[in-house]
């Protein structure tokens, strides 16, 4: 639901690293000394002293979370949050989860959390109001439709333009529809993704464009008939446009420097790759279509 990045990260990273007493850029921040410095400095900047306050939306969907329980450490984003906490020296029982609706997460103002992890894509517009970490997942967009819809078999670039799409306000799925598919009919916009799904199920729209992992879940488990059989399919995913997820912080939060240090360490030691293989590996097999 969302992701130029390099320049912004360099500026924010430099500011944050100075504030926290860490050293180096994203590449050098994975060193033992940088993490050691972060473990000492992070507590002074926690939203609630003595704990790391992490936000996400409710409900929290698979595969990012499992059983709508962020605190169980299961699902990609839950596991990543705890892995970051571990790199920063925060014990598991000192990670506290709070609810932050997706649509309000990237509006300007005071945030009542240390960071938000909620499939939030970095965009230049959002970065004017909040601060993002470096990427913890590079994401593609995909089409979800009912199995009976013509788009399942007819999705050439020209054909894609003829369908009526629907999506949640402010998502990168909606942006992809408008910027890349460029349909002849104005997409319908909803305040929640569940509303778009309901419209899809009742044939009010032809398709939804969402992050590929979300699309797989929607098609296989969320959109079902009365007999609990899937009635939707993931038509395919689009080529990457460089979209990526970042942790979201209040604008200028000095914690971002050390979180970037932790993310770099998790990339270097293979933790992120292993978690992606565990929770997100299936999505690499979704066929690629070109708009």
Which role does the model predict for each range below?
Residues 29-43, 172-188, 227-229, 261-291:
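Ligand-binding clefts/hinges and TM-proximal coupling segments of bilobed small-molecule sensing domains
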Residues 1-29:
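Secretory targeting and sorting signals
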Residues 93-157:
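Acidic, polar ligand-binding/catalytic clefts
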């Amino acid at each position: 639901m969302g992701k130029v990045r390099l320049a912004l990260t360099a500026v924010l990273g430099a500011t944050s690293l100075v504030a926290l007493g860490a050293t180096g850029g994203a590449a050098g921040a994975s060193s033992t000394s940088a993490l050691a410095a972060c473990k000492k400095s992070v507590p002074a900047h926690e939203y609630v002293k003595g704990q790391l306050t992490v936000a996400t939306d409710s409900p929290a969907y698979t595969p990012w979370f499992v059983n709508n329980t962020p605190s169980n450490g299961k699902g990609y984003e839950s596991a990543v949050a705890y892995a970051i906490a571990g790199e920063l020296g925060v014990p598991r029982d000192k990670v506290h989860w709070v609810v932050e609706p997706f649509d309000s997460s990237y509006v300007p103002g005071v945030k009542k959390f240390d960071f938000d992890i909620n499939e939030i894509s970095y965009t230049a517009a959002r970065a004017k109001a909040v601060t993002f970490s470096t990427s913890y997942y590079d994401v593609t967009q995909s089409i979800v439709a009912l199995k009976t819809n013509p788009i399942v078999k007819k999705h050439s670039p020209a054909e894609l333009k003829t369908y009526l799409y629907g999506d949640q306000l402010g998502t990168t799925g909606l942006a992809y529809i408008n910027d890349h598919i460029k349909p002849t009919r104005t997409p319908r916009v909803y305040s929640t993704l569940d509303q778009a799904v309901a419209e899809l199920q009742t044939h009010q729209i032809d398709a939804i464009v969402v992050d590929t992992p979300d699309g797989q879940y929607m098609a296989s488990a969320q959109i079902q008939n009365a007999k609990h059989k899937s009635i939707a399919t993931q038509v395919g995913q689009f080529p990457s446009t460089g979209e990526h997820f970042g942790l979201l912080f209040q604008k200028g939060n000095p914690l971002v420097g050390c979180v970037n240090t932790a993310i770099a360490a998790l990339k270097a030691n293979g933790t992120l790759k292993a978690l992606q293989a565990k929770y997100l590996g299936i999505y690499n097999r979704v066929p690629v279509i070109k708009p």
